[in-house]
From Swiss-Prot:
Species in which this protein is naturally found: Colletia hystrix
Enzyme Commission numbers on file: 4.1.1.39
Gene3D superfamilies documented for this protein: RuBisCO large subunit, N-terminal domain
Modified residues (N-acetylproline): 3
UniProt name for this protein: Ribulose bisphosphate carboxylase large chain
Claim: Lyase is one of the keywords in the record: yes
Amino acid sequence: MSPQTETKASVGFKAGVKDYKLTYYTPDYETKDTDILAAFRVTPQXXVPPEEAG
């Protein structure tokens, strides 16, 4: 049997849904030479609003 480890849920991540505009978009952000641009296409399931799928 493997040894058990204790996990602390409150460290590093707080569960919950936050509005996209409040957490990811920063209008005054200045790009750096080391920044990487990645794009993904998301297709929402039926009855899911497109802004919620992404």
